[in-house]
Amino acid sequence: MNTLVLKIDAILSKHLKKQLAPYTISSQNTYVAFAAKKNGVTVLLYKSGKLVLQGNGANALAQELNLPVAKTVFEASNNSQDIPIIGSDEVGNGSYFGGIAVVASFVDPKDHSFLKKLGVDDSKKLSDKTIQQIAPLLEKQIPHQSLLLSPKKYNELVGKSKPYNAISIKVALHNQAIFLLLQKGIQPKQIVIDAFTSQSNYEKHLKKEKNHFPNPLTFQEKAESHYLAVAVSSIIARNLFLDNLDQLGQDLGYQLPSGAGSASDKVASQLLAAYGMSSLEYSAKLHFANTHKAQALLTK
């Protein structure tokens, strides 16, 4: 997906709005003055005068609209690594046991040599042992913001008749991690989130969050394979999740598995038999189907 970021004046802004009037869409971002979507390309005009075009046809649409395409900034590939980037990723949302770890990291081009020497890559391709070795080095060298939502807090916030669902809670965590990192004086040229929902859905849930920032976002599937900043966040988040999972297991006297398969059902049923539902409230995400499966195992 291509992302173009331009700075346009009031005259060009007025002309742009007129051209794209038939393609207007709503945006929940309070910093966006005008939004449209044409030919699969999302167009966001910010109150600051910054214009963002996102989509595979961004360059073609920019030419059609007579925009200054010479100011093209980014393309979601390794060619975009020559700019300072914040990348955000989460780990744990698909695991029954353990919390959710979200990390936003700032990677400058000067960090690339260090990261390549460490072998930083998509954390999903790395063993847990390697991640646990690399993560402390990244935490020391790379500016980042880590957030961990414990299972207990997750269960208070997520579920039927509760403030969040499984998607909106991740929106809140990503937004807060990036916001706090920006508060440290970080000045990225691009902010990339490993896409877990559509941009429109993200912005819908973002509306109810207290903290906001004006920087445009790039949503990229499997972003950890395209951006070093996201790969760094993925590694740090994975390590944070594993540490939390291990600590929860030590507290309960059980080895808690990652994931949401039959192994989780079995351990959950053992916890229910030993300690009751309070043990799962403390260590697991209750709305997962594993809870009912574990209860069913007790009756056999």
Swiss-Prot record:
Belongs to the RNase HII family. RnhC subfamily. PROSITE patterns: RNASE_H_2. The keyword Magnesium applies. Endonuclease that specifically degrades the RNA of RNA-DNA hybrids. Its cofactor is Mn(2+); Mg(2+). CDD domains: RNase_HII_bacteria_HIII_like, RNAse_HIII_N. This is Ribonuclease HIII. Keywords: Cytoplasm, Endonuclease, Hydrolase, Magnesium, Metal-binding, Nuclease.
